[in-house]
C-alpha cells in the first residue's frame, strides 16, 4: 500500500468517526461507549473503503463491513450490540445515491420523461436500496449467529 492510500484511509476513518460519534450522542449512548462507537464507525468505513479500493463492489463491501461492526463488541463492554452498531453504521448510508435518485425524480416531474433521467433514477435508487439492505442484513446477522439463546436446530 502506498503512502497516498494510507493517507486516504486515515482521512476516511477520521471523517467517518465524527458522524458516528454525533449519532451516538443523539441516540443517548452511555459516555463510556462513545469512543467505541467512533472507533467502530472508523473501522467499518475504512474497511469498506479498502474493499472498494481492491475491487469489491460497494454493496458487498457494505455487507462485509457491517458484519465486521456487529461482531463481539458488546460482549467486551457488557452492553447491547445495537448500542454500538447503529451509530457506527450510519456513516456508511448511501446519501449521494439516494440524493441523486431523488433529484432525478424531481427533474422527471419538472422537465418530463427522458430515458437518461429515468436510467439515472433507477440506477441510483437500486444502488441505494441494495446498500441499505446490505447494511441492515449485516447488522442483524451477528445477532442471529452469536447472540442466539436457543439452539439453531
Curated annotation (Swiss-Prot):
For whether the record's keyword set contains rRNA-binding, the answer is no
Stated name of the protein: Probable succinate transporter subunit YjjB
Q: Which organism is it from?
A: Yersinia pestis
GO terms for biological process? succinate transport
Chain segments annotated as transmembrane: 7-27, 51-71, 83-103, 125-145
**According to its record, what are the GO cellular component terms?**
plasma membrane
Q: What coarse category fits the chief subcellular location reported for this protein?
A: membrane
Q: How does it assemble?
A: The transporter is composed of YjjB and YjjP.
Record membrane topology: Multi-pass membrane protein
InterPro entries with a match to the protein in the record: ThrE_2 (IPR024528), ThrE_Dicarb/AminoAcid_Exp (IPR050539), YjjB (IPR020914)
Where's it found, cell-wise? Cell inner membrane
Listed PANTHER family: SUCCINATE TRANSPORTER SUBUNIT YJJB-RELATED (PTHR34390:SF1), UPF0442 PROTEIN YJJB-RELATED (PTHR34390)
Which key words tag this protein in UniProt? Cell inner membrane, Cell membrane, Membrane, Transmembrane, Transmembrane helix, Transport
So what does this one do?
Involved in succinate export with YjjP. Both proteins are required for export.
- State the family named in the UniProt similarity comment for this chain: Belongs to the ThrE exporter (TC 2.A.79) family.
Amino acid at each position: 500500500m502506498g503512502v497516498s492510500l494510507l493517507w486516504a484511509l486515515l482521512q476516511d476513518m477520521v471523517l467517518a468517526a465524527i458522524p458516528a460519534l454525533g449519532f451516538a450522542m443523539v441516540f443517548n449512548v452511555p459516555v463510556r461507549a462513545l469512543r467505541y462507537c467512533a472507533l467502530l464507525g472508523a473501522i467499518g468505513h475504512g474497511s469498506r473503503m479498502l474493499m472498494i479500493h481492491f475491487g469489491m463492489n460497494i454493496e458487498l463491501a457494505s455487507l462485509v463491513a457491517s458484519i465486521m461492526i456487529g461482531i463481539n463488541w458488546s460482549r467486551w463492554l457488557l452492553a447491547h450490540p445495537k448500542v454500538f452498531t447503529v451509530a457506527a453504521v450510519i456513516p456508511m448510508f448511501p446519501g449521494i445515491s439516494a440524493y441523486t435518485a431523488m433529484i432525478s425524480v424531481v427533474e422527471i416531474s419538472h422537465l418530463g420523461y427522458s430515458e437518461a433521467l429515468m436510467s439515472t433514477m433507477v440506477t441510483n435508487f437500486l444502488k441505494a436500496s441494495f446498500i441499505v439492505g446490505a447494511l441492515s442484513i449485516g447488522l442483524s446477522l451477528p445477532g442471529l449467529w452469536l447472540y442466539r439463546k436457543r439452539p439453531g436446530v
